[in-house]
From Swiss-Prot:
Keywords, sorted A to Z: Carbohydrate metabolism, Cell wall biogenesis/degradation, Disulfide bond, Glycoprotein, Glycosidase, Hydrolase, Polysaccharide degradation, Secreted, Signal
Gene encoding the protein: rhgA
Protein name as it appears in the record: Probable rhamnogalacturonase A
Single biological process term from Gene Ontology: pectin catabolic process
Task of the protein: Pectinolytic enzymes consist of four classes of enzymes: pectine lyase, polygalacturonase, pectin methylesterase and rhamnogalacturonase. Hydrolyzes alpha-D-galacturonopyranosyl-(1,2)-alpha-L-rhamnopyranosyl linkages in the backbone of the hairy regions of pectins.
GO molecular function: polygalacturonase activity; rhamnogalacturonan alpha-L-rhamnopyranosyl-(1->4)-alpha-D-galactopyranosyluronide lyase activity
Amino acid sequence: MHSLSLISLALLSPLLVNAQLSGHVGPLTSSSSKASTKTCNVQDYGAKADKETDIGSAIEKAWDDCAEGGVVYIPSGDYAMFSRLKLSGGKASAIQLDGIIYRTGSDGGNLFMIEHSSDFEFFSSTSQGAIQGLGYEFHKDGSLNGPRLLRFYDVTDFSVHDVALVDSPAFHLSLDTCKNAEIYNMAIRGGDSGGLDGVDIWSENVWVHDVEVTNKDECVTVKSPAKNILVENIYCNWSGGCAMGSLGADTNISDVVYRNVYTWKSNQMYMIKSNGGSGSVSNLVLENFIGHGNAYSLDIDGEWSSMSTVSGDGVQLNNITVRNWKGTEEDGAARGPIKVVCAEKAPCTDITIDDFALWTESGDEQTYSCENGFGSGFCLQDGDGTSSYSTVITETAAPTGYEASSMSNDLSTAFGTDASIPIPTIPTSFFPGATPYSALAGAASGNAAKATSSATASRFRHRRGSH
């Protein structure tokens, strides 16, 4: 168990205080304690590991017995799931997925939806549990109308860890109006198509760390409303890339940190996307990014043409820090590594771009383009946003220190949309040189009961030695 008092928090660096977690994250009770209270093995409720019998009713019955204190246990084996589950309420409970669940049936909705719950954990004690969505069965016909794999709504004090989410017909993992969550030690692997988001967050006080995402849309993305979000040690491995948005009317996002993000062969390293709208984004830090082979690098686009224009003057962006970015981009002349386009009636203010060194993989020049963005660094102009401007700077010399490490598991090609995607092994490295905050649960012990005790309770773990 790790915890950090608010007094200790105040003594840490200003960065820690101003723009990340506001308190503890994760469940309040360890899964081992929950299991000792009660364990509901789904096989005792009719589940069969035959890859044919619908496991849904067995999970529902087990949940009814263990939701108020206990663990719903899904042993190793292959299970079919035709049902679309909505598990509501409960406290001091967990779902231990050590088997593999295969989506069957063509209904949409959510394969798993957890709502109105607290002190909850969804995990695998072996790090081999998975949900296989078999989304290609929809995607090969051009359809995105299948179910999302895992969605949380109005859940507090919870974690999701050591599970793989594979080939969702739609989104993989969504956190909707949740609080005090920790997401870690996960592999998410989707098809090469838009609409197959990895992790989407519109919640408060959430820590996402040590997660790998492969898809063609969002890697780990913050949506509105959101506050106190910390995203660390992220591996966007042939993905859409991390982002914020799309942002529309009444945007309300603040105190967000992305740190140690490695992006390979993706659409962008980080994008903030809007077109019109209202509200604000404030206190955003994007630091320690490495990228290779991406179409865009830093892409702040207040006139994003891929979304319909929303009524309003634009979303106000304020106090954004971008620092320590290294690597290469695909074509720096066609799509330069810095693009900051802000609305004329809602200019971006107090933006800092520092220690930023990327170079083109094609050709011998790259551009930096800024429009109505005010602050310091590269093409940004000093000012308070009372005047408008647009400028493009062309760079013909590679910046000093742009070279950056790569990851040994970088994919050589994307996964398609017309064949089954294999279930991956959860990696033990997510960013060059960074040690994951938690060992995989399956590495702790071969004994499932002992492995569950590795889950943390009421913790606020801070970055070790990174201040």
